[in-house]
Amino acid sequence: MTALFYLLFLTSVIIETHQECDMEKLDGDFPRQNNGYLYVCKDVETCFHICEERDLNRNHAKCCYENCFCEHLHGEKIRKQNVSLKI
């Protein structure tokens, strides 16, 4: 029982840390927010394209997949993320 509790605790710490780090890496007009949603790139190629437009190296923290938030509000390569969720 103790091992299960410890495993659940570690999992929640890792998830929370990952989510906090994602937001800490963003600045400027990232993320794009509209009507209570964030608009996030679905794939790494879209993210890299946005980073190249901003003259950012692909190894830059803002270009890590899932850290790159899209400027465009619509498109098949964009997903909506509810802002009310704790990020």
Swiss-Prot record:
InterPro entries xrefs: Scorpion_toxin-like_sf
A molecular function GO annotation: sodium channel regulator activity
Record keywords: Disulfide bond, Ion channel impairing toxin, Neurotoxin, Secreted, Signal, Toxin, Voltage-gated sodium channel impairing toxin
GO CC annotations on file: extracellular region
Disulfide links within the chain: C41-C63, C47-C68, C51-C70
Major site of localization recorded for this protein: secreted
Known tissue expression: Expressed by the venom gland.
Compartment(s): Secreted
Signal peptide: 1-19
Family assignment from sequence similarity: Belongs to the long (4 C-C) scorpion toxin superfamily. Sodium channel inhibitor family.
Biological function: Putative sodium channel toxin.
Annotated protein name in UniProt: Putative sodium channel toxin Ts40
Organism taxonomic ancestry: Eukaryota, Metazoa, Ecdysozoa, Arthropoda, Chelicerata
